[in-house]
Amino acid sequence: MLQKKPTLLTQEGLERLTKELEHLRTVGREEVAERLHQAFQDGQDDDFVDNAELEAARNAQAFLEGRIQELDEILNNYQIITEDMA
């Protein structure tokens, strides 16, 4: 497997991405879970094939998990840059 080059981050960028990841893992996942639950409950009376809200919630979940994975990859392979490196 090829080793990817590290992502170059400032200290501020690292902190921002770390906060975003924590937010997505907690609040983001909670919100998507609630949205999925609500769409599922609302869909009990409808035909699941035509449940647009359930499909939208599943898409939101896929996007969220993709972003979490992307941030994990960045934060597992980064290099802090400083002004003297620029």
What does each model-identified segment do?
Residues M1-N59, F63:
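N-terminal cationic and glycine-rich segments that engage phosphates or anionic surfaces
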Residues D45-N51, Y78-A86:
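Glycine/charge-rich, flexible interdomain linkers and switch-proximal surface loops
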Residues E55-T82:
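Anionic-ligand-binding alpha/beta catalytic cores of soluble enzymes and soluble regulatory domains
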